[in-house]
């Protein structure tokens, strides 16, 4: 009887730590995580009133959750570049250098992707001043 109790205790403890449908940590250097963080940074840049394009500096934290597809909760840092929104000179945002001494922002995005539908949606995107500054 004690052996059964011990086995049940271990199994219950294990199942609680691997909760189905729960958020799981992801590698911040994962290619998909960087792709989705870049997408969210680009969307924030479009919505901002800044004269300059903003781009991804680094991914701080990332989690995923299996739903009908996959939801990603990504925290990342963005900063303005030297590229003006109404200017020319760079073909790709990745080529734009960061604007020196400009404040960085820390952003959190919830992104939902359903690969079989080729569908990716930004469900939530919020940024605030306070990332590291170069």
Swiss-Prot record:
This is Cystatin-1. Belongs to the cystatin family. Disulfide bonds join 83-96, 107-127. Residues 21-116 form the Cystatin domain. GO terms for molecular function: cysteine-type endopeptidase inhibitor activity. It comes from the Eukaryota. Gene3D superfamilies: 3.10.450.10. InterPro entries: Cystatin_dom, Cystatin_sf, Prot_inh_cystat_CS. Inhibits various C1 cysteine proteases. This protein has no toxic activity and its function in the venom is unknown. It may play a role as a housekeeping or regulatory protein. Keywords: Disulfide bond, Protease inhibitor, Secreted, Signal, Thiol protease inhibitor. It is found in: Secreted. A motif (Secondary area of contact) lies at residues 65-69. GO terms for cellular component: cytoplasm; extracellular space; vesicle. Residues 1-17 form the signal peptide. The record marks 21 as: Reactive site. Expressed by the venom gland. SUPFAM superfamilies: Cystatin/monellin.
